[in-house]
Regions:
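Conserved alpha-helical scaffold segments that buttress catalytic/binding sites
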Residues: 2-248
Length: 248
């Protein structure tokens, strides 16, 4: 899956947002590549390949582009997947389960500006979750950036969620988790909008310390760049800065 780019042209998934108000009626989903260097990360230069589009809080249309590809890295002997909109994490968790990198009842360490836990009564059955094709369709044509975690909990791949969204959450993590041994049932789910300029009041080194501690404990890592919520060049810059010493 994700072995060929495509457009979503119907009012589903993230394309549902303000669909009737937008002149552009399609969103671009790139293909994934295996990357060995951060130098392979390239920004999108095709203006027709919009990653996310909606009206912002000032009611102005915000058109957002991402990178040319999704990227799969091997870092410190574990897999890290980098992509744009956060609901894609849902697919990659199930892909990792199918490859026996993870199994069920994982603890999700969710580091993000937003909770992503809206419950919109979207459910994937246990039988359908074993089909990557059905998981792919559910991810790309049903879920959106706000509601992908609850269906994963209902199905069982995620058991509990640790929400890290502010300074207190970061400090609580260090107090409660940093001294614990590595756990084979942890997924790190990082949104780089945690580094958006409006959150600069949260200490960068504190963010980095928690992210790297969670990274070391996790069996699998999903990272999104959230084009609607943070400048993409800033997001990639922070991604590189945090993980530069982990790349194999």
């Amino acid at each position: 899956m994700y072995n060929k780019w495509f457009f979503i042209e119907s009012p589903v998934w993230n394309n549902e947002f303000s669909f009737d108000k937008r002149q552009n009626k399609k969103l671009f989903v790139p293909e994934i590549i295996e990357a060995k260097s951060f130098d392979e990360i390239k920004f999108q230069d095709d203006l027709e390949k919009i990653a996310f589009e909606d009206f912002d809080f000032d009611n102005k249309l915000s058109t957002n582009y991402w990178l040319k590809n999704f990227y799969r890295f091997q870092m410190w002997w574990k897999e890290v997947v980098l992509f744009d909109n956060h609901n894609h994490a849902f697919y990659f968790w199930y892909e990792a389960r199918s490859r026996k990198i993870i199994w069920n009842k994982n603890l999700l360490i969710h580091i993000d500006q937003h909770a992503d836990t809206r419950d919109n009564d979207k459910i994937i059955s246990k039988s359908d979750s074993k089909s990557l094709e059905k998981v792919f369709d559910f991810t790309n044509f049903v879920l959106n950036v706000w509601d992908y975690i609850i269906p994963a909990q209902k199905e069982g791949i995620i058991e509990n969620v640790v929400q890290i969204r502010n300074t207190k959450n970061l400090e609580d993590y260090l107090q409660n988790f940093s001294n614990k041994k590595n756990n084979s049932k942890i997924i790190l789910n990082l949104d780089l909008d945690f580094f958006a300029s409006e959150l600069d009041f949260i200490d960068f080194e504190l963010k980095k310390k928690v992210i790297l501690d969670a990274f070391e404990k996790a069996s699998y890592v999903t990272v999104c760049t959230s084009p609607f919520f943070v400048d993409q060049r800033l997001a990639v810059e922070k991604f590189k800065e945090i993980f530069k010493e982990k790349l194999l």
